[in-house]
From Swiss-Prot:
It comes from Aromatoleum aromaticum (strain DSM 19018 / LMG 30748 / EbN1) (Azoarcus sp. (strain EbN1)). Gene3D superfamilies: ApaG domain. The lineage of its organism: Bacteria, Pseudomonadati, Pseudomonadota, Betaproteobacteria, Rhodocyclales. HAMAP family: ApaG. Residues 3-127 form the ApaG domain. PROSITE patterns: APAG. InterPro entries: ApaG_domain, ApaG_sf, Uncharacterised_ApaG. It comes from the Bacteria. This is Protein ApaG. GO terms for biological process: error-free translesion synthesis. PANTHER family: F-BOX ONLY PROTEIN 3, POLYMERASE DELTA-INTERACTING PROTEIN 2. The gene is apaG.
Amino acid sequence: MSESEKYRIEVEAIAEFVPGQSDPDENRYVFAYHITLTNTGEVPAQLISRHWVITDGAGKVQEVRGLGVIGEQPMLAPGQQFSYSSGSVLETPVGTMQGSYQMAAEDGHRFDAEIPAFMLAMPRVLH
């Protein structure tokens, strides 16, 4: 068995614009995102920390690092899922988010679960 099969977390992200909290006249665009992590590997693994790279439509980059997600450091058994929602505020109506979760397997091995890039976009802005 290869290491990539033994230690694997799949990350799925869905984002949506939140018009009620946004104010385009003030360059404030609020987005909610919903994340699902699935342990598709063969050993239990705990989410230790996160690293986000958030890029707005003007190319401005913010990096966010911290322990856990929404105050939790969930342990995922093989086949188990963990979902959560959070948000991000941009100064432009479009942007992207990507990054990684730092994981610790039950056997002590540490690895990153990549968060594929996903789009943040106010409806009717992209054609």
